[in-house]
C-alpha cells in the first residue's frame, strides 16, 4: 500500500480552489471572488473565497481548509470508534453555488482528506467527497448530462463505482422529515482507502477536476432563461430545504462546528435569501409540481 502524503493532497486542493474560482468567474462574467484567509487557534486554517451579487451567481463560496487537532471530534468517531484519542489532520475544498436564475440549479461539491495518527500505530486515513445538483425547475436533459458526466468520471476506476456512489449520494442527501431528496444527486463517497493511497487520491482528484465539466454546461444553457416573481418565490422556498439539510443532517457542517471550525466558512453554504411557507403544496400539473412528482425521489438517469 502506498504511503499517504498529506502535502501532495494539500497542494492539489489549493490548486483546485484556484481553478474552480477562475472557472466560476468566467461563467459569471461580472463579479470577482473576495478572499478571506483565517487561522484556527487549535491548529490550521484556510481561505474562504466568496463571490456575491454577480450577473449569474447570487452567491458562490469556495472554501479551502486545513485543520489539525490533538483528538478527533465526536462526529468523526461516531462510525469509527477506533479513531478516538488520535491526533488528526483534515483538509478539503468545499463549495456551494446559489445562482440568481431559478432555472439554474444550485450545486454543492466537496473533496476532502483525513489522516489520524497515534504513536506506535499505522496512520488511519481516508478520502471523501462528491458533488450534487439541486434544481428548482429541472430539465431532464440537464439531469441526464450531469449523471452521464458523473458516470464518465467514475468509469476508469471500475464499472461498479458510479452505481455505488450514485446510490450513496441519493441516500445521503435525503431529508427524512420531508421524505424527499435534496435534489437529483450525483456522487458521494467517504472512507475511501481500500485501493491504497495513490489510487484513492486519483479518484478524489478526478471528482474535483470533473465538477466544472459537469456544472458549467448547465449554467451556460440556462443563464439567459427569462423568469418572473413566481419562479423567484419558488426558488426561495426550495432553498429552505438546503438550510434544513445542512443544519440538521450534514456531517461536514457538524464536524466543522464540533471542531471549533470557522463559523463563517462553515455556514458559507447558506443561501443569501430564503423563505418558508406553511403547508405549501404545488398546484397539480404545474412546473413546480413536476419537481416534486419526478425529481425528488431517486431515479436511474443513465
From Swiss-Prot:
It comes from Shewanella baltica (strain OS223). Homodimer. Transmembrane segments: none annotated. GO terms for cellular component: cytoplasm. Pathway: Porphyrin-containing compound metabolism; protoporphyrin-IX biosynthesis; protoporphyrinogen-IX from coproporphyrinogen-III (O2 route): step 1/1. Keywords: Cytoplasm, Heme biosynthesis, Metal-binding, Oxidoreductase, Porphyrin biosynthesis. It catalyses: coproporphyrinogen III + O2 + 2 H(+) = protoporphyrinogen IX + 2 CO2 + 2 H2O. Residues 242-277 are annotated as: Important for dimerization. GO terms for molecular function: coproporphyrinogen oxidase activity; metal ion binding; protein homodimerization activity. It holds the Pfam family Coprogen_oxidas. This is Oxygen-dependent coproporphyrinogen-III oxidase. A divalent metal cation binds at residues 98, 108, 147, 177. Involved in the heme biosynthesis. Catalyzes the aerobic oxidative decarboxylation of propionate groups of rings A and B of coproporphyrinogen-III to yield the vinyl groups in protoporphyrinogen-IX. It comes from the Bacteria. The record marks 177 as: Important for dimerization. Its main location: cytoplasm. The keyword NAD does not apply. PROSITE patterns: COPROGEN_OXIDASE. SUPFAM superfamilies: Coproporphyrinogen III oxidase (SSF102886). Coiled coil: none annotated. Belongs to the aerobic coproporphyrinogen-III oxidase family. The keyword Disulfide bond does not apply. Its cofactor is a divalent metal cation. It is an enzyme of class 1 (oxidoreductase). InterPro entries: Coprogen_oxidase_aer (IPR001260), Coprogen_oxidase_aer_sf (IPR036406), Coprogen_oxidase_CS (IPR018375). Its EC number is 1.3.3.3.
Amino acid at each position: 500500500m502506498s504511503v499517504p502524503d498529506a502535502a501532495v493532497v494539500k497542494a492539489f486542493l489549493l490548486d483546485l480552489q484556484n481553478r474552480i474560482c477562475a472557472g466560476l468567474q468566467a461563467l459569471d462574467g461580472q463579479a470577482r471572488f473576495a478572499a478571506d484567509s483565517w487561522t484556527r487557534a487549535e491548529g490550521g486554517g484556510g481561505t474562504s473565497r466568496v463571490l456575491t451579487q454577480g450577473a449569474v451567481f447570487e452567491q458562490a463560496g469556495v472554501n479551502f481548509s486545513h485543520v489539525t487537532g490533538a483528538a478527533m471530534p465526536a462526529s468523526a468517531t461516531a462510525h469509527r470508534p477506533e479513531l478516538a484519542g488520535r491526533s488528526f489532520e483534515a483538509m478539503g475544498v468545499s463549495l456551494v453555488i446559489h445562482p440568481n436564475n431559478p432555472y439554474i440549479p444550485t450545486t454543492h461539491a466537496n473533496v476532502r482528506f483525513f489522516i489520524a495518527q497515534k504513536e506506535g500505530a499505522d496512520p488511519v486515513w481516508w478520502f471523501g467527497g462528491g458533488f450534487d445538483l439541486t434544481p428548482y425547475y429541472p430539465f431532464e436533459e440537464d439531469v441526464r448530462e450531469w449523471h452521464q458526466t458523473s458516470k464518465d468520471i467514475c468509469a476508469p476506476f471500475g464499472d461498479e463505482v458510479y452505481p455505488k456512489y450514485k446510490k450513496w449520494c441519493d441516500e445521503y442527501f435525503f431529508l427524512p422529515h420531508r421524505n424527499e431528496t435534496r435534489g437529483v444527486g450525483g456522487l458521494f463517497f467517504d472512507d475511501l482507502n481500500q485501493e491504497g493511497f495513490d489510487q484513492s487520491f486519483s479518484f478524489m482528484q478526478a471528482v474535483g477536476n470533473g465538477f466544472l465539466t459537469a456544472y458549467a454546461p448547465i449554467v451556460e444553457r440556462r443563464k439567459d432563461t427569462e423568469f418572473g416573481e413566481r419562479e423567484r418565490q419558488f426558488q426561495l422556498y426550495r432553498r429552505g430545504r438546503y438550510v434544513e439539510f445542512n443544519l440538521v443532517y450534514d456531517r461536514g457542517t457538524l464536524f466543522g462546528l464540533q471542531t471549533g471550525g470557522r463559523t463563517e466558512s462553515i455556514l458559507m453554504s447558506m443561501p443569501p435569501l430564503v423563505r418558508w411557507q406553511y403547508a405549501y403544496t404545488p398546484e397539480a400539473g404545474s412546473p413546480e409540481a413536476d419537481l416534486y412528482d419526478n425529481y425528488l425521489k431517486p431515479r436511474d438517469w443513465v
